[in-house]
């Protein structure tokens, strides 16, 4: 830039300056929101009795108590059964399944997790046939129970979060219909909302009984509930 050009150039115009300020403000707000959200999450974890209990009793997550409560109410786990856990990280549901006497337990998750003795764990995608084949190779036959504690990353917008989680449940239901043994059971997390009705209707076509369970271990104010379906039929 020449000296004449420098003298003539007055810097960015007011519109560009305003746009830049707004962009910076949005970034600061977003960063602060993430920071506040993280602080709330940490505080909630520190105050959560189930988090402390899980640590004391050797479970990998507080979610283990949800499955224990669900099983106490619905009797979906039994000795000698074959279990598939979709979205299994960090492994609490696998631990409970083995503890309750399951003979074979396999799990799959996009996230890596440490091995659990007695279980086959695949780092992969339930939508990838090769990953599913590797997981199912860990079973000697068709599964008796399919579990899914999958949930989409939350956005803070209830309806969006609900629809995204319902999409995961629909994927889990499709997996169950394809792989579950006759008479088998299915348990999955859903968020309360209107779209859940379609999932329930689909389950009622393929299972003798379908019901909702809200474990006490679910956090107060959480919209999550669990759908439990028993008596699979094609």
Swiss-Prot record:
InterPro entries xrefs: RNA_methyltr_RlmE (IPR050082), RNA_MeTrfase_FtsJ_dom (IPR002877), rRNA-MeTfrase_E (IPR015507), SAM-dependent_MTases_sf (IPR029063)
Catalytic activity: uridine(2552) in 23S rRNA + S-adenosyl-L-methionine = 2'-O-methyluridine(2552) in 23S rRNA + S-adenosyl-L-homocysteine + H(+)
Enzyme nomenclature, EC number: 2.1.1.166
Catalytic residues as annotated in Swiss-Prot or TrEMBL: 189
Localization, UniProt: Cytoplasm
Gene Ontology cellular-component terms listed: cytoplasm
Positions of region (Disordered): 1-37
Name listed for the protein in its UniProt record: Ribosomal RNA large subunit methyltransferase E
Protein species of origin: Hyphomonas neptunium (strain ATCC 15444)
